[in-house]
Amino acid sequence: MGRSLKKAPFVDEHLMKKVEAQAHDEKKKVIKTWSRRSTIFPSFIGYTIAVYDGRKHVPVYIQEDMVGHKLGEFAPTRTYKGHAADDKKTRR
């Protein structure tokens, strides 16, 4: 179930302040955040935001097609190592 259309998209205030402060600087730095729940706004385009995945900060370069999605969608939290090999040949 998605967010109600009556409400505005959510973004953490501290993240929005960091992006606005970065807009005034001529040098673009990586913005670190723990806010996986924040929605990507059009003003984020062109910035690199390091999203925390539980172990480390994963750098995510924001592009135009990411607008409207959540930051956490682009920093997976689980590592998939694959299923165990098929042992039918070794059982014989």
Curated annotation (Swiss-Prot):
InterPro entries: Ribosomal_uS19, Ribosomal_uS19_bac-type, Ribosomal_uS19_CS, Ribosomal_uS19_SF. GO terms for cellular component: cytoplasm; small ribosomal subunit. It comes from the Bacteria. GO terms for molecular function: rRNA binding; structural constituent of ribosome. GO terms for biological process: ribosomal small subunit assembly; translation. The keyword Protein biosynthesis does not apply. Keywords: Ribonucleoprotein, Ribosomal protein, RNA-binding, rRNA-binding. Belongs to the universal ribosomal protein uS19 family. Protein S19 forms a complex with S13 that binds strongly to the 16S ribosomal RNA. NCBIfam families: rpsS_bact. This is Small ribosomal subunit protein uS19. It comes from Streptococcus pyogenes serotype M49 (strain NZ131).
